Amino acid sequence: MTKHKITAVLGPTNTGKTHLAIETMLSFDSGMIGFPLRLLAREVYDKVIKKISVDKVALITGEEKIIPTNAKYFLCTVESMPIDKHLDFVGVDEIQMCADHERGHIFTDRLLNMRGEKLTMLMGSNTIKNIISKLDGDIEFINRERLSKLTYAGHKKISRINRKTAIIAFSAEEVYAIAELIRRQKGGAAIVMGSLSPKTRNAQVELYQSGDVDFLVATDAIGMGINMDLDYVFFSNLKKFDGKKLRKLNLSEIGQIAGRAGRYLNDGSFGITGDCKEITAEDVELIEGHKFEEIRTLFWRNSNLILTILKV
C-alpha cells in the first residue's frame, strides 16, 4: 500500500460526506471522485460546474462522457474512473460497496489501487471500518454523525402518505404501478430508476425537486447518495432480486435507503406500505440507531492478472 495520505470519512446517511469530498477535491489543483451511480455523478457534475469553469470539469459514466481538453476534475462512476491519471485528490464514494456480490470487485480494486498524489478519501458506512483498517494501519478515520433524527412511521396506505415521500419498489413493473396509483389518487409522481436514459432520469429528478410533483417512486438506487428533498421513505417491499435470486434486504441496505428521509437538520421518517411485512421492533431500533453488522468479506479480482491473461 502507498504511503500517500488516506482518509476514510465514515457514517450513516445525511452526514455530509459527499459534500466534504467535493469541497476537499476543489481545494486541490486536480482531483477525481468515483460514485456508485451515474445519476449521482451527473448531479455532482452539475453542482461543480456552477462553482468553477465548465472547461475544467469532466463527467465520465457508462452513458455520458464530457471530457474537456484541459479538465482538472473528474466526476465518474466507479467503473469509469480512468486509472492512468495522476491527480492530487482521489475519492471513492460508498466504499462499503466492496462487499457487493455484483460490483464489489470494482470498488475493492479502487480501494487497493487508486491513490491521489496528495490525498485519497474513502466515503461510506461505518460497517467497513474494521476491515479496511486491517488493509492499511495508517488510514485516518473521521466519524460523521447524522445531522437529523430518523424514526419509524409504521404502515401507511398509499392514499394516506404525506407529500415529500419516496416509495421504494424493486421492479420496473411495480414502480410504474405505484406511480399510476399515486397519479390517480394524489395528482402526480416522478420516477427514478437506473434503467431510464440520462435525459429522462434527470428530467424526472427535476420534476420532483422543483415541486411540480410531491411524490417520488424509485428503486433502491436512491439509497446510493442521490440527494432528494424527502421527509419520508416508504418501502413497498423488503425483498429484491440481486441478479441471482430473490432475497430479503439486510438491515444495512434498509437503513441506507430509509436514511434518505430527512435533509440536513430536518428529521426524517421511514415506513412500509402495501403488502410489505412489518419490520420488527428490534430491527427498527437498529435502523434508527444506525447500528449494523460489520462487513467481514470484500470481493476482489486481480485486475493485473486479468490484464496479463488477456495479453497472452
Tell where the protein language model's regions lie, with residue ranges.
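Long, largely alpha-helical accessory region at the distal end of helicase-like NTP-driven motors
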Residues: 285-312
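Conserved helicase ATPase core of P-loop NTP-dependent helicases/translocases
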Residues: 46, 56-70, 177, 188-219
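Inter-Walker segment of RecA-like/P-loop motor cores
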Residues: 42, 48-86
